[in-house]
Design a protein with these regions (language model features):
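Positively charged n-region of N-terminal signal peptides that target proteins for export
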Residues: 1-4
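Bacterial N-terminal signal peptides
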Residues: 8-18
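Boundary at the C-terminal end of the N-terminal hydrophobic targeting segment
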Residues: 19-24
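Catalytic cores of carbohydrate-active enzymes
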Residues: 29, 33-37, 42-46, 50-55, ...
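Substrate-binding groove/exosite segments of carbohydrate-active enzymes
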Residues: 40-173, 177, 278-279, 299-323, ...
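A generic secondary-structure signal for well-formed alpha-helical elements
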Residues: 79, 83-86, 125-128, 156-163, ...
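Active-site lining segments of carbohydrate-active enzymes
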Residues: 89-112, 116, 173-221, 243-244, ...
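Acidic/His metal-coordination segments adjacent to aromatic residues that form catalytic metal sites
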Residues: 96-99, 130, 134-142, 201-223, ...
Length: 362
């Protein structure tokens, strides 16, 4: 899908979500502008054909681009495939895998996609599901919120922006702080000023850094732009929630920490030569006789030292959370998105540049 189509879909979706309540009637089968029942029934490929559920619960989109429209409703079907119910105390939650593998937490949830799931579920007409899932990660024994990277506090605040619930938001604050401190105690390197994470636990099992180490699946703990962006976003979210609750000292502490984290990330993970954000190795690494020094960015050392590639899509994650002002010098990174020597591909961007020496179809 071309980037223009993607941008168009974002604009249309934004309009749809902002205006759904203006145009919708209470009837399950009709609306003043859109025949919701007819639209959803036209998506005949959906496995879930509980048409009434879609009509009652999701915001509707009608646009002339069939690919965008089909993708939009397919994403809502995925929500239904992974929606489950724990018990009366936990309420609704989402799985990552339908078969609930052994590494999942209570009732099958896994923290890796939790930020995405909360971002999507917040647009349901009722806030019940997204608010239940927010509580799940904070209150449920066995939820395992720190098994994988995620932007939990930021996502919880995003849910509240659509379905305001000051009482619930305030009740989750201490748990969100405890979760953040859990990450900080285990993954923050005060000597560097950044959080470290492995690609595997950052939701990227195959990555350039780990494939240059002895452990290609779980190796190469690094100061990754993705994980540090998540932790910056969570710190800012906790500060905002604390502000809403009148907890001024917590607000101040987390804002100050976020500011320092951002400054350090820009100074250490941005490569002005390659104009992109890269992971920085935490430890000395070696593979096949090639040594990589701790504190170097991907391809600054080792077998491919000096190569002009090494970019991965995680270098764009900081923009998800608006870490920079518009027209910042870091926007040069976006030149690679539509570059055929970079990430451009016919069916969506590749995770590694296509002409990278370590490009791999996996």
């Amino acid at each position: 899908m071309r980037i223009a189509h993607v941008l168009t879909s974002v604009l249309i979706l934004s309009f749809c979500l902002q205006t759904q309540n203006l145009f919708a009637q209470d009837s399950v089968n009709t609306s003043a502008i859109l025949d919701r029942s007819a639209i959803i029934r036209s998506q005949r490929f959906l496995d879930n054909q509980d048409w009434d559920w879609f009509v009652e619960n999701i915001p509707f989109l009608d646009c002339p681009d069939e690919d965008i429209q089909t993708t939009y409703y397919y994403r809502w079907e995925l929500i239904t495939k992974h929606l489950t119910y724990g018990n009366p105390d936990t309420g609704y939650l989402f799985t990552e895998f339908i078969d609930r593998p052994f590494w999942s937490g209570a009732y099958g949830a896994i923290s890796c996609p939790a930020g995405h799931q909360l971002y999507e579920a917040r647009w349901l007409r009722s806030g019940e599901i997204a608010k239940d899932y927010s509580r799940y990660w904070v209150n449920t024994p066995g939820a395992q919120p720190r098994n994988y990277s995620t932007w939990l506090a930021d996502a919880v605040l995003a849910v509240d922006a659509v379905h305001p619930d000051p009482e619930q938001l305030g009740g989750l604050l201490d748990g969100l702080i405890a979760n953040y401190e859990g990450w900080r105690n285990r993954h923050f390197d005060a000597s560097v000023g950044l959080f470290w994470q492995t690609g595997h636990d950052d939701g990227m099992e195959f990555n350039i850094a780990s494939r240059q180490t002895q452990d290609i699946l779980r190796g190469a703990p690094s100061y990754r732009p993705s994980f540090n962006a998540y932790m910056w976003a969570d710190a800012k979210a906790i500060a905002k929630i604390a502000s809403k609750q009148g907890r001024v000292e917590i607000e101040k502490q987390f804002n100050e920490f976020a500011d320092k984290l951002r400054t350090t990330m820009l100074a250490k993970l941005w490569d002005p030569k390659r104009k992109f954000f890269f992971p920085m190795f935490k430890n000395n690494e070696n593979r096949d006789g090639y040594e990589i020094s701790a504190g170097t960015l991907v391809y600054q050392d080792g077998r491919f030292a000096g190569d002009n590639h090494g970019r991965e899509l995680i270098g764009y994650v900081p923009w998800q959370f608006s870490m920079f002002e518009p027209k910042s010098p870091y926007e040069e990174a976006w030149a690679k998105l539509m570059d055929t020597d970079g990430f451009f591909a016919d069916y969506g961007p590749t995770t590694v540049e296509r002409n990278d020496p370590m490009f791999l179809l996996q």
